[in-house]
C-alpha cells in the first residue's frame, strides 16, 4: 500500500473547510471550479500512478494539446477583451506584465528546483502554480461574477495532464503520489480566499487586474503546448528512444490537431452555451 502524504491530506482538508465558507458566501462558480480542478488533478494522478513504466506518447500529446488550446482561446476571448474594455493602455500593460511575470516565475522556479528542501520539487512547482492560478481565478470571479463557468473550467483543464505526468514521475521515483493532493487542492484554497477580496472600482485597476490574469494564463497555456522534441517533456515521460525522430515527427501533427481542437471546442461551447 502506498504511503499517504500528510501535507497532501492537509491540503485536501483545507479545501473542504474553505468550501464551507464559499457556500455561505454564495461563491458557487468559484466552488465549482475549485472542485473540478481538484478532481482533474487527483483523478489524473491516480491514473498516472498506475500507468507502469511507460506512457503512450500520443495520449500525452492530446491531453496537453486539448488543455493548452482551450486555455489559450479562453484567455484570449474572455479575459483580454475585458482588460482592454476597462482601459486599453492599462489593460495592455497588465497583459504584458502577466506574461513577463509568468516567465520570470517559471525561470526562477527552475533554479529553486536545485535547492535541498524536504518536499518533492515537481510537487512544489505544481503547488506554486496552483496557488497562483487559484488566486487569480478568485480575483476575477469574485469581482466579475457574471463571467460564465467556461473560462474557469478551460483554465483548470491543464491540471489533468499535469497531474498525470507528475504522478508518473513520482511513481517511478518511489515517492508517494498522494503529495499531489496539495497542488490539486491549491487552486480552490487560494481561489476561495481571493474571491472574498474586493478590487477597488477603477477602470485602470480593473484593466491591470484582468490584463495580468490574461497574461499569466496565456503564459501557462503556452508552457503546456505539446512540444515534440528530443529531450522535451513528451520525449522524457513517454520514455522514447534516442532514434525516435520519426515518431516525434508524427506526434507533431497530433500536437497541431489537438491544440486546434481545444480552441474549437471552446468556440463551440461559447456559441451554444455562453451566447444569450
Where are these regions (language model features)?
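Intrinsically disordered, metal-sensing/regulatory segments
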Residues: 1-276
Amino acid at each position: 500500500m502506498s504511503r499517504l502524504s500528510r501535507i497532501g491530506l492537509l491540503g485536501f482538508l483545507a479545501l473542504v473547510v474553505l468550501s464551507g465558507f464559499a457556500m455561505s458566501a454564495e461563491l458557487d462558480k468559484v466552488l465549482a471550479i475549485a472542485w473540478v480542478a481538484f478532481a482533474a488533478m487527483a483523478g489524473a494522478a491516480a491514473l498516472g500512478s498506475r500507468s507502469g513504466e511507460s506512457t503512450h506518447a500520443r495520449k500525452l500529446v492530446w491531453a496537453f494539446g486539448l488543455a493548452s488550446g482551450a486555455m489559450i482561446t479562453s484567455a484570449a476571448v474572455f479575459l483580454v477583451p475585458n482588460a482592454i474594455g476597462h482601459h486599453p493602455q492599462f489593460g495592455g500593460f497588465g497583459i504584458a506584465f502577466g506574461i513577463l511575470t509568468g516567465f520570470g516565475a517559471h525561470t526562477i522556479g527552475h533554479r529553486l528546483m536545485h535547492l535541498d528542501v524536504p518536499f518533492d520539487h515537481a510537487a512544489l512547482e505544481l503547488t506554486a502554480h496552483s496557488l497562483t492560478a487559484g488566486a487569480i481565478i478568485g480575483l476575477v470571479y469574485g469581482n466579475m461574477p457574471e463571467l460564465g463557468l467556461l473560462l474557469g473550467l478551460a483554465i483548470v483543464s491543464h491540471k489533468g495532464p499535469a497531474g498525470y505526468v507528475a504522478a508518473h514521475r513520482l511513481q517511478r521515483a518511489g515517492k508517494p503520489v498522494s503529495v499531489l493532493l496539495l497542488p490539486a487542492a491549491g487552486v480552490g484554497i487560494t481561489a476561495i480566499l481571493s474571491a472574498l477580496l474586493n478590487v477597488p472600482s477603477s477602470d485602470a485597476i480593473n484593466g491591470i487586474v484582468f490584463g495580468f490574469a490574461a497574461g499569466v494564463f496565456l503564459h501557462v497555456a503556452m508552457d503546456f503546448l505539446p512540444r515534440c522534441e528530443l529531450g522535451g517533456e513528451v520525449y522524457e515521460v513517454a520514455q522514447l528512444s534516442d532514434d525516435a525522430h520519426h515518431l516525434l515527427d508524427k506526434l507533431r501533427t497530433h500536437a497541431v490537431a489537438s491544440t486546434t481542437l481545444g480552441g474549437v471546442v471552446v468556440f463551440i461551447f461559447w456559441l451554444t452555451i455562453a451566447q444569450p
